[in-house]
Curated annotation (Swiss-Prot):
CDD domains: PPase_ThiI, RHOD, THUMP_ThiI. It comes from Shewanella sp. (strain MR-7). It is found in: Cytoplasm. InterPro entries: Rhodanese-like_dom, Rhodanese-like_dom_sf, Rossmann-like_a/b/a_fold, ThiI_AANH, ThiI_fer, ThiI_N, THII_Thiazole_biosynth_dom, THUMP_dom. Keywords: ATP-binding, Cytoplasm, Disulfide bond, Nucleotide-binding, Redox-active center, RNA-binding, Thiamine biosynthesis, Transferase, tRNA-binding. This is tRNA sulfurtransferase. HAMAP family: ThiI. Belongs to the ThiI family. Catalyzes the ATP-dependent transfer of a sulfur to tRNA to produce 4-thiouridine in position 8 of tRNAs, which functions as a near-UV photosensor. Also catalyzes the transfer of sulfur to the sulfur carrier protein ThiS, forming ThiS-thiocarboxylate. This is a step in the synthesis of thiazole, in the thiamine biosynthesis pathway. The sulfur is donated as persulfide by IscS. The active site is at C458. The keyword Hydrolase does not apply.
Length: 484
């Protein structure tokens, strides 16, 4: 069994050297991701496609491979195929017939062929021959070229016939690391998760910068969002998560800054700090989730004033998106439930925010800050490899337990993503198992029976520890981590 990875059309339009570089990078990215699923994964690059081979003795890996490929930037779509050899057009038909006889019975169908290589026939001739044979010697209703109930997809390359058994849509975009790195300001809300995802999809290695205004609980929640985005869409490359203790800045704003200017001043201080951190990391651009007119600090006038605080390029991929469109995208990429349970701190510090800030007035207000404030904040920022989040949780999860045995009043919650759970169901005889994906746990845990203890389970124990620590921070103490 194999997968044929089709490149995103924008890659195909590049010049030959750029196309080769992008294709080679995509091959490396696919290999990096799939090797974490199975060490025997085989990945081979061609000019206009990439082949992925599922080990013959491990057909169960096909679903896992397909799910991972669907989340790798730079892929238009993936087709899962079974491989056959052939000697003639009739030989092709004879091999297609037993595979599709039952599938097209009582239905309309058509045959579609893609062919590469030198043959004494063309694609249309194969379509007519195979289609005619299937129409004559099966119980199909007939051929319908437009909107058939079943499409028989075949690909021919040299003397090989590939029958397409499944088509998986890809992310599109460019392969990871074909663009320069960016530093994304992430709060854990709807907007910043989507803006981060869009730059991952565009091929930029996306690092995360979090301005902590709400203590440990807020940081844990944001780390879950960042880890989910990286693990799902950017796992092929290492990135950093930077946590900035921003409470001192907020304290000085509340104490010294005019009420109407607070929102704009806060954003300018964030941009200054992020720019300093980005420079240290060799990054040339900051990404934010700002959208025009969404809040008072995001008017054109205010955004212009905010941008004047630094020479660093500030990118706003959501600038013209409606809020509902952002939420819909948030739901699609799996960060909606995180965002719903995330506290919002930035909007409460100004009662009468200005929508037309004057640069001179804002700069005058900023002279009231302590001279070394940003220097101190930057020095206190903590940057970690995002892969270390699991290890960090191990050192902080002292308030909960990791168990291997299950007691009478304990319930196991399988928090894996639905596709993971379906691929490898958790079954424990005599034990109640609830299936709540990790991205829904924060919103659904409050509805569970408080008299019972819940054991969180995931494949590697990373997300279960994150979720346990987050729930403990919220005041729940009937939660443990289950590691059989």
């Amino acid at each position: 069994m194999k997968f044929i990875v089709k490149l995103y059309p924008e890659i195909m339009m590049k010049s030959k050297p750029v196309r080769m570089r992008f294709t080679k990078m995509l091959e490396t990215n696919i290999r990096n991701v799939l090797k974490k699923v199975d060490e025997d994964a085989k990945v081979q690059r061609q000019w206009d496609r990439i082949w992925v081979k599922v080990p013959n003795d491990k057909p169960e890996l096909a679903q896992a491979f397909g799910e991972r490929l669907a989340c790798i930037p730079g892929i238009a779509h993936v087709v899962q195929v079974d491989e056959y050899s052939f000697t003639s057009v009739d030989d092709i038909y004879q091999q297609v017939l037993p595979v599709y006889r039952d599938q097209i019975a009582g239905k309309t169908f058509c045959v579609r062929v893609k062919r590469t290589g030198s043959h004494d026939f063309n694609s249309i001739e194969v379509e007519r021959y195979v289609g005619g044979g299937l129409n004559q010697f099966t119980d199909a209703v007939g051929v319908r070229l437009k909107n058939p109930e079943v499409t028989v997809n075949l690909e021919i390359e040299g003397d090989k016939l590939y029958m397409v058994t499944k088509r998986i849509e890809g992310l599109g975009g460019f392969p990871m690391a074909t663009q320069e790195d960016v530093l994304s300001l992430i709060s854990g809300g709807f907007d910043s998760g989507v803006s981060s995802y869009q730059f991952i999809k565009k091929g930029a290695r996306t690092h995360y910068c979090f301005f902590n205004l709400g203590g440990a609980q807020h940081e844990i929640g944001v780390k879950q969002v960042a880890y989910h985005l990286w693990k799902t869409y950017g796992e092929s490359h290492k990135v950093k998560f930077v946590s900035v203790p921003f409470e001192p800045v907020v304290a000085e704003i509340l104490e010294k800054i005019d009420n109407g200017q607070m929102g704009v001043v806060l954003k300018r201080m964030m941009m200054r700090t992020a720019a300093r951190i980005a420079e240290r990391m060799g990054i040339q651009a900051i990404v934010t989730g700002e959208s025009l007119g969404q809040v008072s600090s995001q008017t054109l006038t205010n955004l212009n004033v905010i941008d004047r605080c630094t020479d660093m390029l500030i990118l706003r991929p959501l600038i013209a998106m409606d809020k509902q469109d952002i939420i819909n995208e948030c739901r699609r990429i799996g960060t909606e439930d995180f965002a719903k349970s995330m506290p919002e701190y930035c909007g409460v510090i100004s009662q009468k925010p200005t929508v037309k800030a004057v640069l001179a007035k804002v700069e005058a207000e900023e002279t009231k800050f302590s001279e070394d404030l940003i220097d101190r904040i930057v020095e206190q920022a903590v940057a970690i490899d995002i892969r270390e989040i699991a290890e960090q949780m191990n050192t902080r999860i002292t308030e909960t337990e990791t168990v291997v045995a299950i007691d009478t009043n304990e319930v196991v919650i399988d928090i894996r993503a639905p596709e993971e759970e379906e691929n490898k169901p958790l079954e424990i005889e005599g034990v109640e198992i609830k299936r709540i994906p990790f991205f829904k746990l924060a919103t659904q845990f409050a509805d569970l029976d408080k008299q019972k203890t819940y054991l969180l389970y995931c494949e590697r124990g990373v997300m279960s520890k994150l979720q346990a620590l987050y729930l403990i921070e919220q005041g729940y103490h009937n939660v443990k981590v289950y590691r059989p």
